[in-house]
């Protein structure tokens, strides 16, 4: 360990974040390595180590001969201060070596509020911020993750973007880099070759021009780059990598358990949900393989909790059979199975009993909207009756805590829809009174609302976010309407949601704003301890750009959007059709009921695994 680090660690919070040495961390002999990869997560250790995608790609890269992938996380403020004071560059956990010793610096970016953390980590690593300043092959700075479906705000800082699922594409990129270095290519030669790989977007190979009103006038590829870059997917989930020997963190993290991915994609088609669109098509992992991974992961790590994870886990066809298969093993080892947010329309007592075999926790449902009219607009095909029946089932089975998630500011929302949220909570309370076997325990109902953020590649990508003032008015309206003492109301901070809406649909000009805000001190914007909207507004003002242009403006369907060179596999025509259906309050059936022709099926030969 670096002597400077030894002196620093006693002075910072949670020093275990920075020392590595965890069980299952990969260590290799440097003399046998020709390519080193710094896999960076632009958030804290606790958040990054909870990310399944990072665990998967860490394993994929470390299975390559001659390649060593190491982890790097954004330091907390106290650690950053100590690093800068000691003039100690950012380092990787496995070896402790500075990031400048690495060939490839790869960022996993799932959230727009992490953009300034990317700049901060590059600076802490003593790596030039701008891609144009990094003229050699080393380091090659790449980024992937769902936030990269619109990478334009950070286009000036990233050499290339990996779109979609990275298990196969990451290997191809690393091998291409090794070829480039072995044959003495220039960086431009490498970037031009990378752009020919399916799923690779190279920002510097696209010229973007603007109209006088600030909208994009043209996106022009050059040097043979494709006009449209389509994401990559894993075709067969049974052949895809799963991190059975996952790293066991040395300090508590957010998701400190085995995360078992059952399938990718979603059959439901909620019109606001970016993940539901960009992870299409549906591809399932076989039940037997899921069970095998569960047993082996628990045996190896000692974890006693397993999350059965997918976008809509209860839509996994053999879910009940999987729980049956795992029942004996989990009972013997005192392992609990848990699910993330459940759908109210397919929740059952049978499923609940299997979950209750372990530690019985509260249940979470996401109705998203307070009235059926608005649920139809967003294609959340769940009725109030279905929600209440699920709650009755849960309360009768001994559950006494329910969390309900909603959004405020959805397209066409009215005050009646907002007040409908309070009505839903009251009806859930009434369902408890009707169904609970032991009323002495009481009940806890938590209503949480977030501010709707329109996202690229969704049916609502053209919509405006409501103003901050209007959002806060609706929050207050709902606060006053929730009068039951057993109902707790939590709402999301408005400032971060506003900036998220700006960055999510931003263009390349926001790169100047990002850098200006970072130089003013922005770095861990996903954390309220460090976020300052005033700092960002000053940066916008200095750069002569209006954030409301990005967040609060309805786009014409004819407008060329900044991310128009990127395809998630879902066609623009389908997204427009879904938008029109929304305004007509017409729902679209789920993919299992009827193929709606979104286009994603063409990524898997024409037929989805629904």
Predicted regions and their residues:
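Glycine-rich beta-alpha loop elements in corrinoid/cobalamin-binding modules
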Residues: 75-222, 459-507, 515-529
């Amino acid at each position: 360990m670096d002597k400077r680090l030894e002196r620093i660690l006693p002075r910072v919070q949670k020093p275990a974040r920075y020392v590595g040495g965890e069980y299952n961390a990969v260590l290799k002999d440097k003399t046998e390595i020709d390519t080193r990869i710094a896999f960076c997560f632009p958030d804290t250790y606790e958040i990054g180590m909870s990310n399944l995608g990072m665990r998967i790609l860490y394993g994929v890269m470390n299975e390559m001969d001659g390649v060593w992938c190491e982890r790097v996380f954004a330091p907390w403020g106290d650690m950053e201060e100590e690093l800068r004071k000691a003039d100690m560059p950012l380092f990787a956990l496995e070896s402790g070596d500075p990031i400048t010793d690495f060939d490839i610096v790869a960022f996993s970016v799932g959230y727009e509020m992490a953009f300034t953390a990317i700049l901060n980590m590059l600076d802490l690593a003593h790596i030039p911020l701008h891609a144009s300043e990094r003229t050699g092959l080393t380091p090659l700075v790449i980024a992937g993750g769902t936030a990269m479906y619109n990478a334009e705000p950070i286009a000036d800082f990233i050499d290339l973007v990996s779109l979609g699922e990275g298990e196969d594409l990451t290997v191809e990129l690393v091998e291409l880099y090794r070829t480039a270095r072995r044959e003495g290519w220039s960086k431009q030669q490498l970037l031009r070759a990378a752009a020919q790989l399916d799923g690779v977007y190279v920002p510097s190979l696209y010229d973007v021009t603007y109209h006088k009103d600030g909208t994009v006038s043209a996106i022009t590829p050059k040097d043979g780059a494709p006009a449209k870059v389509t994401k990559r997917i894993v075709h067969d989930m049974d052949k895809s990598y799963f991190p059975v020997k996952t790293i066991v963190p040395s300090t508590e993290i957010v998701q400190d358990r085995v995360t078992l991915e059952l399938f990718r994609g979603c059959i439901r088609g909620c019109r606001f949900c970016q993940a539901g669109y960009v992870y299409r098509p549906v591809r399932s992992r076989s039940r037997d393989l899921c069970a095998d991974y569960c047993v082996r992961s628990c045996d190896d790590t000692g974890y006693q909790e397993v999350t059965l994870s997918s976008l809509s886990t209860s839509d996994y066809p053999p879910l009940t059979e999987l729980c049956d298969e795992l029942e004996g093993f989990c009972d013997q080892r005192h392992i609990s199975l848990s699910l993330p947010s459940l759908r109210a329309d397919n929740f059952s007592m049978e499923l609940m009993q299997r979950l209750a075999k372990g530690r019985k926790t509260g249940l979470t449902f996401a109705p998203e909207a307070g009235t059926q009219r608005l649920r139809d607009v967003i294609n959340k095909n769940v009725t109030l009756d279905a929600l209440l029946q699920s709650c009755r089932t849960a309360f009768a089975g001994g559950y006494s805590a329910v969390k309900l998630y909603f959004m405020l500011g959805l397209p066409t929302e009215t005050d009646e829809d907002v007040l409908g949220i309070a009505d839903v909570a009251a009806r859930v309370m009434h369902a408890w009174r009707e169904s609970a076997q032991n009323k002495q325990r009481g009940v806890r109902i938590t209503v949480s609302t977030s501010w709707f953020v329109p996202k690229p590649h969704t049916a609502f990508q053209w919509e405006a976010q409501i103003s901050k003032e209007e959002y806060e008015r609706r929050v207050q309206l709902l606060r006053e309407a929730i009068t039951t003492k057993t109902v707790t109301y939590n709402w999301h901070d408005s400032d971060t949601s506003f900036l998220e809406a700006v960055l999510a649909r931003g263009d390349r000009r926001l790169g100047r704003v990002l850098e200006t805000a970072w130089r003013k001190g922005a770095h861990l914007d996903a954390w309220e301890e460090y976020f300052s909207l005033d700092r960002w507004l000053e940066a916008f003002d200095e750069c002569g750009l209006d954030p409301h242009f990005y967040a609060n403006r309805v786009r014409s369907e004819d407008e060329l959007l900044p991310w128009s060179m990127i395809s998630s596999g879902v066609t623009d025509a389908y997204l427009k059709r879904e938008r029109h259906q929304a305004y007509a309050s017409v729902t679209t059936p789920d993919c299992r009921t009827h193929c709606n022709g979104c286009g994603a099926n063409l990524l898997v030969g024409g037929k989805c695994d629904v």
